[in-house]
Amino acid sequence: MILLFIPVGILAGILGTVTGLASLASYPALLYFAGLPAVSANVVNKAALMFNSIGSAVSSTQELHGHWKELFKTMIIIFFGGITGAILLTALPSSSFTHIVPVFIAAGGIMILIPSKNEEDHAGANNFEPRKGHVNQHSWLRNILIIFLVYLIGAYSGYFGAASGILLLVLLTRTSSNEYTVSNAIRNVAMGAANIVATIYYSFEAHIVWILVLPLGIGFFIGGYIGPKIVRVLPVKYIRILTGILALILAYTQFSAAYNIKLFYLF
């Protein structure tokens, strides 16, 4: 049964690096196949997700060429935001946030469906040269706002986390002239900082079922390596559509669970 989580991790890792929704596959599997309670499943999922970022980093060197400084800055902000989220988690139960989470997820899903004006919609051409000067083209006030928003996303990821990767991708694609594949690569690796924070926090405050983290993490690493290669060859518009649809489905399920309202007969 434990080895089952390797293919689960591969599927979740691909979903995570392509759409930012790894938990759509991994979290339910931990609940139903492993029989973990919700909190324990979230802990295992966060710990295993670190390997997804590692696999993505190994696979995305082409996209990240010339963008390592930008990635490092984003990771630092996400890291400190994640610390804030972990601290808030000790003071506020995550259940207090469940009623507005569907709004965040739905907003991210809708925004990802709308291409940014700075983005070139290409079908996988290997054109990853960094664009000179794009970092300094914003005013200092806008830069501060971007830093603050990245920090908030990091805090949200450390506190609750659902679809935080989509929110970061939406922000990155709208605040830089990077191609979609580059922003996606930065998102995939940078979000690992929040998962590192969460894992360190849970190591002291909760019990981590490491026997499940290992096979799931192996799968996440493999899926994280495969995902960027898929993004590299698929047209961006199809990735956007898939991500948007999955995000809206997740938003509905979160809405249904939070408000105990079912708009459809089966779910």
Predicted segments, located by residue:
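Hydrophobic alpha-helical transmembrane segments in multi-pass integral membrane proteins
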Residues: 84, 152-159, 198-206, 213, ...
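Transmembrane helix-loop junction
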Residues: 32, 40, 90, 99, ...
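Membrane-interface alpha-helices at helix entry/exit sites of multi-pass transporters
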Residues: 37-45, 68-73, 177-188
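Selected transmembrane alpha-helices and immediately adjacent juxtamembrane segments
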Residues: 1-37, 124-184, 214
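Residues within membrane-spanning alpha-helices of integral membrane proteins
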Residues: 2, 46, 101-105, 109, ...
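Transmembrane helix exit motif
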Residues: 55-65, 102-135, 249-265
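Selective hydrophobic functional segments
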Residues: 43-99, 195-241, 245
